[in-house]
Amino acid sequence: MVTLATIFQQYGPAYREQGGNTLLPSHLRVMWCIEHCRTAALGGHRYQCDTCGEVVYSYHSCRNRHCNQCQLDKAEEWLAQQEAMLLPVPYFLVTFTLPQEMRTVAYANQQVVYNLLFRCAAEARQALAADPRFVGGQGGAIGVLHTWKRDLGYHPHVHFLVPGGGLDFVNERWLPARNHFFVRVEPLSKLFRARCAMG
């Protein structure tokens, strides 16, 4: 079975050589952890049967949050926690992508730019949700940062799972989104780009 670890083990050296000093230390660390998860490189325990003498090795896990081999249970637990918070309303997937012009700066300043991406996306989404032409209330969201496309090209974007409506705190009521969509993409895109440009 092909796993991320086997891909990294097979193609990682060439990738690291090609990337040279443009690869971030954090990415190199993740690759190293995944490549060596549950291998002798991380140490382990040796168990031996008292009856037949059979020896079995149990190697340590890397415990890196990006490792799908040893952290799958935690990922599934997180997903179950998020599902438990869902309201009995329709939901929308809203995606915000960092403008192409900002990606070189983003790659060199990831923490600052990713925080900016989340903040600008959340503010734009909330501003339009509060607009009575769309929802007219305060909405919620669960956001997840993705930094790569399927072909592993650098492509920072945030996915928000957004309930189809919002709370009107003045009248203490739920306001459902209209016309089977959350907000219109054109004004949302413009507002998001303007907020990104302002920083």
Model regions and ranges:
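Beta->alpha loop/short-helix hinge microenvironment recognizer with preference
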Residues: 1-199
